[in-house]
UniProtKB/Swiss-Prot annotation:
Residues 194-396 are annotated as: Disordered. Regulatory subunit of glucosidase II. May be required for defense response elicited by pathogen-associated molecular patterns (PAMPs). It comes from Oryza sativa subsp. japonica. Keywords: Disulfide bond, Endoplasmic reticulum, Glycoprotein, Plant defense, Signal. Residues 1-19 form the signal peptide. Glycans are attached at residue 115. This is Glucosidase 2 subunit beta. PANTHER family: GLUCOSIDASE 2 SUBUNIT BETA (PTHR12630:SF1), N-LINKED OLIGOSACCHARIDE PROCESSING (PTHR12630). Pathway: Glycan metabolism; N-glycan metabolism.
Length: 614
């Protein structure tokens, strides 16, 4: 009897304990944060489809299509059941699993009205989770300290970069003005040098043409001299042959045709002819040409080579003309005709006597023509002399012009003193002062250009341009850097100049925040995208528009951030084709608000154990 009583007491105690652990029926399956929604007398369906009274809550009849009225039963297919799982992690299951004979909740709350008794295993199952949570809380505590330090450094660095950018922009403006001035002066120098070059080319061309002309004249004179020498040699031979022939013909004529009439005719003719010759030759002897030359003139070159049949006077006149420069072409021709007439006298005596009276007149005409041609030649040589003198005068004048080409500035001394920058001046002040000194010193109107001064201007221009280029490059880098969003507290500022790598199998993945992400295999690199933006409140980094997959989309990468004491990239995967994911641990995600939430969760799980034990 006593034994039965003891067993009955044990059963009653177990039943009471089970009833105590099970939540009230009206709140069964409702999350703690939603309990206030079900406190009213009339409750609205969450989808707005209708209303139901509080006494119909969990009555095992579905009044709302979305299962709002049956969170603790399996009456509604769309209903959800909340497992509190005290001492472990709470979960939500479909209402269809309630009282199905399978323990889905570690606290057994889902099988409250079934033939199965579920043991509460939440504390044992949650031990590993609690240990993990404790470690996570400790990591967050250390990470928050590191994050705060990094934020302070980032703010200082960001402000420093902003100040540097502002300073560089000011220096760029000043330096740009100096470069513009030097550019303008450099153009003036180049213009002056170009003018000087053209002047020299023109002068060299003129001198070359004069040299070529002089060489041509000398060659022409040389050819003419050779031709005259050859002509003289030929004429000398002909003259000797003519003398011999004349002597022979004279004897033959005297022997065959000697008559008194012819003798008297010849005697009358010779004195008169001689007198006429002396009369006409006298003016030429009294006024010889101003300039004589051993070299024959052009008119002498054109003298007929055939001198046969000339008299001694004619031959003498021919020889004399070579030394005096007198023209004897027409005289020789007239004398030759006269000589032939004399030879014809025996056959035509009457005509000869009639012609004798005309001989002096003919001689006068001939000599008059000779005299006129000599005068013409004289004037011709005078003109040639004048032409040579004009050329000489032109050369002298031109040389004088070239010698006086320098401007008056060549005679002036450089009274500008050299500038020495103060040791306390900055590099920009030194450049400004040096450029101003150069611009004051250099004379841009001097011709020819002073090469040393021109080189100095060019050197200052090159130096200033080089510094300006470096400043502009730095400005571009800082501007591109500062335009990015580095988080609410600049916590990601130090990510800009860093890259994080992870080796997964045969690939090496490289992520460079704010720039690009890539997949490296040996010497081959595949782009996984360029920087796009932050997502989910700075918890995800998005890289887009990478290399296109074969018959697929462009590659992309999402990097999920989590709290960690070091910056480490891991967990790279490709869940969908050409869409990659990765995890990056960093102190930047260890924020204080999240730390407080974790501490409360850990405390709640510990308090639940104490409550259960009680």
């Amino acid at each position: 009897m006593g034994l039965h009583a003891i067993l009955l007491l044990l059963l009653l105690r177990i039943s009471a304990s089970a009833a105590a652990s099970r939540p009230p029926l009206d709140t069964l399956g409702i999350p703690p944060q939603d309990e206030a929604y079900f406190r009213g007398g009339v409750i609205r369906c969450r989808d707005g489809s209708g209303r139901f009274a509080r006494d119909k809550l969990n009555d095992d009849f579905c009044d709302c299509p979305d299962g709002t009225d049956e969170p603790g039963t399996s009456a509604c297919p769309e209903g959800k059941f909340y497992c509190q799982n005290a001492g472990h992690s709470p979960i939500t299951i479909f209402s269809s699993r309630v009282n199905d004979g399978i323990c889905d909740c570690c606290d057994g709350s889902d099988e409250y009205d079934s033939n199965v008794t579920c043991k509460n295993t939440c504390w044992e199952a949650g031990k590993a989770a609690r240990d993990k949570l404790k470690k996570k809380v400790a990591t967050y505590k250390s990470g928050v300290v590191i994050r705060n330090q990094e934020i302070q450094k980032a703010k200082v660095a960001f402000a420093k970069d902003e100040a540097e950018l502002a300073k560089l922009k000011g220096e760029e403006k000043i330096l740009q003005g100096l470069v513009d001035k030097l550019t303008e002066q450099k153009k003036l120098i180049e213009k002056a040098e170009e003018e000087e070059r053209l002047r020299k080319e023109k002068e060299e061309k003129r001198m070359k043409e004069e040299a070529e002309k002089q060489a041509a004249d000398e060659k022409k004179a040389s050819d003419a001299s050779q031709e005259v020498d050859s002509q003289e040699n030929h004429e000398t031979v002909q003259e000797d042959e003519s003398k011999v022939a004349e002597h022979h013909d004279g004897h033959a004529t005297s022997h065959d045709n000697h008559t008194p009439e012819s003798e008297s005719s010849v005697e009358q003719h010779d004195p008169e002819s001689q007198d006429d010759i002396s009369i006409k030759a006298a003016p030429a002897d009294e006024s010889p040409p101003e300039e004589t030359s051993a070299a024959p003139t052009k008119e002498q070159e054109s003298t007929p080579a055939d001198s046969e049949g000339l008299s001694r006077e004619e031959l003498g006149r021919l020889v004399a003309s070579r030394w005096t420069g007198e023209k004897v072409d027409e005289v020789s021709k007239d004398d030759k005709n006269e000589h032939e007439a004399e030879h014809d006298m025996p056959e035509h005596s009457e005509e000869t006597h009639e012609d004798e009276s005309d001989v002096p007149e003919s001689a006068e005409d001939s000599y008059a023509g000779y005299h006129s041609e000599v005068e013409d030649d004289r004037h011709k040589y005078d003109d040639e002399d004048f032409s040579h003198e004009s050329d000489d005068e032109y050369v002298d004048d031109h040389d004088e012009h070239v010698a006086s080409y320098k401007s008056d500035d060549d005679q002036k001394g450089d009274d500008h003193s050299d500038f020495t920058a103060s040791g306390q001046a900055s590099w920009l002040d030194k450049i400004q002062q040096t450029v101003q000194n150069v611009l004051r010193t250099f004379n841009f109107f001097k011709t020819p250009v002073d090469l040393s001064e021109a080189s100095r201007v060019r050197k200052e221009y090159d130096d200033a341009s080089s510094k300006l280029s470096k400043i502009q490059s730095r400005i571009s880098t800082l501007t591109d850097k500062l335009k990015h969003d580095f988080g609410k507290e600049k916590e990601f500022y130090y990510f800009y100049d860093q890259c994080f790598e992870s080796k997964e199998g045969k690939y090496v993945y490289k992520v460079c925040p704010f720039k690009k992400a890539s997949q490296v295999e040996g010497h081959s690199t595949t782009s996984l995208g360029r920087w796009d933006k932050f997502e989910e409140s700075y918890r995800v980094m998005q890289f887009s528009n990478g290399d296109r997959c074969w018959n697929g989309p462009d590659r992309s990468l999402k990097v999920r951030l989590r709290c960690g004491l070091n910056n480490e990239l891991n967990g790279v995967d490709e869940p969908s084709r050409c869409e990659y994911v990765a995890v990056l641990s960093t102190p930047a995600l260890c924020d204080e608000q999240k730390l407080k939430e974790l501490e409360q969760k850990l405390k709640a799980s510990s308090n639940q154990r104490d409550h259960d034990e009680l």
